[in-house]
Amino acid sequence: MGRGCLAALLGGAVAVAVLVAVVHCAVTYDKKAVLVDGQRRILFSGSIHYPRSTPEMWDGLIEKAKDGGLDVIQTYVFWNGHEPTPGNYNFEGRYDLVRFIKTVQKAGMFVHLRIGPYICGEWNFGGFPVWLKYVPGISFRTDNEPFKNAMQGFTEKIVGMMKSENLFASQGGPIILSQIENEYGPEGKEFGAAGKAYINWAAKMAVGLDTGVPWVMCKEDDAPDPVINACNGFYCDTFSPNKPYKPTMWTEAWSGWFTEFGGTIRQRPVEDLAFGVARFVQKGGSFINYYMYHGGTNFGRTAGGPFITTSYDYDAPLDEYGLAREPKFGHLKELHRAVKLCEQPLVSADPTVTTLGSMQEAHVFRSSSGCAAFLANYNSNSYAKVIFNNENYSLPPWSISILPDCKNVVFNTATVGVQTNQMQMWADGASSMMWEKYDEEVDSLAAAPLLTSTGLLEQLNVTRDTSDYLWYITSVEVDPSEKFLQGGTPLSLTVQSAGHALHVFINGQLQGSAYGTREDRKISYSGNANLRAGTNKVALLSVACGLPNVGVHYETWNTGVVGPVVIHGLDEGSRDLTWQTWSYQVGLKGEQMNLNSLEGSGSVEWMQGSLVAQNQQPLAWYRAYFDTPSGDEPLALDMGSMGKGQIWINGQSIGRYWTAYAEGDCKGCHYTGSYRAPKCQAGCGQPTQRWYHVPRSWLQPTRNLLVVFEELGGDSSKIALAKRTVSGVCADVSEYHPNIKNWQIESYGEPEFHTAKVHLKCAPGQTISAIKFASFGTPLGTCGTFQQGECHSINSNSVLEKKCIGLQRCVVAISPSNFGGDPCPEVMKRVAVEAVCSTAA
């Protein structure tokens, strides 16, 4: 960061008694990098989306990102959150964009603002407001005047806000980059010439807003000048910009993957993520953004998909709750430090590539400022011994070593020296709740319908996304002489729906349910139809589970019951109900009465006592009160005993829950070889999401109102509030582990050997209470499964206990003298340790 920009950013960070001059920062680019005040920069960035956390979390998240070695915070701008109805804007609470950007500025960091306004992001309707679908004549993301007018209006609104607050770097603010559109390349091919015209218009419109900072388009090879095209993906080392005078930028380095209800948790090993980043840098990449760095939570009904979970954890370096995910956070922090040591050669010279073996090579950057080298082993199966500058180096499989002086290794992507945190959800029993219940009214449906229509209506056209729920209600007359009433073959009902979930009621009784999937959100329901003689009420509850967030022609997408709806087995054969008269009710009665709110929950009589647990029927509202647990650990609700529905705390929506069990392949994972989303799966046979984040800032000290709407039926007595804490820490470090401090000292002409060390650290308020495993020698296994190898020092446990028990953090040198002697001379040794963290009394 240039001195002028740094002064401007920090000028807003502290209250001082003198005026701080606004320093205008010039942000430009050339083929090597983004230039800030004329200085080429290697920039590490991380995605943190402001609506996916609370304003009270922003300071801590951004400070941790800065501590992790980031320079930039990247965020989308969420159109449907900011303009829920045409011309009515919301920039409050979690949507206070200006406050978020100023929080980044206060931390002395930059911002990459992705205005879009299409964002994808597994966010409801891709960030578009649903009302946009009903603008006459609209066609999304193509050369269409109604769409372009709306898009330009919102883009101008956001840019105008940023300018009025002096938030662009050209005004002394932190925003150094902006983005228009998002991942248009695949969609643009669908539109042909109209798509090309649209993307040219979008670029010209954005540049014409005169922000004074560069604009970016990601996954758009045809981005017109001066807009920079950038890469998204698990790897981007083969990417090149579309013009030789543009920098090589990676706007989304996927740190993990999103999760869908019914799917497994997708994890990306940090060794592979670090390898991908180092490989990008050695090929000339100079801007890297982790998507996500903190994923956060899809509060309310903001999750897209459909079927995207409420948790947007993304296996990111900072987990859903804002805690460091180790070793991912720490290992990437060391990577950033190592790359920054090479910054001047990297931005000053093109690499010289030298072959070191059949699958090994060196990328060397030489300039007047020094020499830096990246030694790569692309073999995913075996170590490689290579000679570089007449020195011998050992490279683990699928790894890159970084040498800031072309001599000393300070970092290897596959050699993890930081600790691993073992996390737990701890319920202390103090949060047990007394539950009350209120049954959603089904019998009175259609008494006062919103509307009636001949035939079936598309769900969004009726609800306008004001609720997930829409009732389709009709009647069926049955003659008393029907054979099925005299013991004949039972009737059946089939329903075709565009998704996403369907509950079928006949005469107030649940007949069955059906669900789509992300791959095929359409539903084909087939089940018994328990009709009786006379008039029967058929009520279909269609449930949206997040609107799709990716694809083309948003204006044509359908949700809800589309038909046909057919009764089978009558004496007449089949009776098609599709074109009967249908009545519609938007939302639930409980929603209309605001049962989720402090005021509304007092407007009805709630069932109390033992009847609540005994009567686990569908479409039920549950209510309980609880006091806020002590401490400052993040909180979560255990919903594993429930089925499917929504949760509110003090009137604010936690999000959708669904105890759908994960199906997949969880046979294990190794970091080597190209990563793809199905590669490393976890959670098979368990609920995809069991725990739901409860922000502490939403709570009051006592009598917090918890309301749950349950669609299917569940046991509310087992819902519990828990704290997310560190239960233990592990480390596994070689006595020859690369050390950045070694190189820094040696580079100043005083070579000095520094022993590798094991660092253990519990969470604040905790101490190390026990050593479950310790071995100095050749231990086997990984965290949680360590065991002694052929070589083991008998003093291992006692040394670790003496150094660590009773402390929050400890450091243990890896040397024979520290362990009372060398248990196996001439053998490379390691220390593996697993320690227990306990809350201090």
Swiss-Prot record:
Residues 1-25 form the signal peptide. One of its GO terms (biological process) is galactose catabolic process. It catalyses: Hydrolysis of terminal non-reducing beta-D-galactose residues in beta-D-galactosides. Disulfide bonds: none annotated. It comes from the Eukaryota. It is found in: Secreted, Extracellular space, Apoplast. Glycans are attached at N392, N461. Its main location: secreted. Keywords: Apoplast, Glycoprotein, Glycosidase, Hydrolase, Secreted, Signal. One of its GO terms (molecular function) is beta-galactosidase activity. One of its GO terms (cellular component) is plant-type cell wall. Its EC number is 3.2.1.23. Pfam families: BetaGal_gal-bd (PF21467), GHD (PF17834), Glyco_hydro_35 (PF01301), SUEL_Lectin (PF02140). It is an enzyme of class 3 (hydrolase). Belongs to the glycosyl hydrolase 35 family. This is Beta-galactosidase 5.
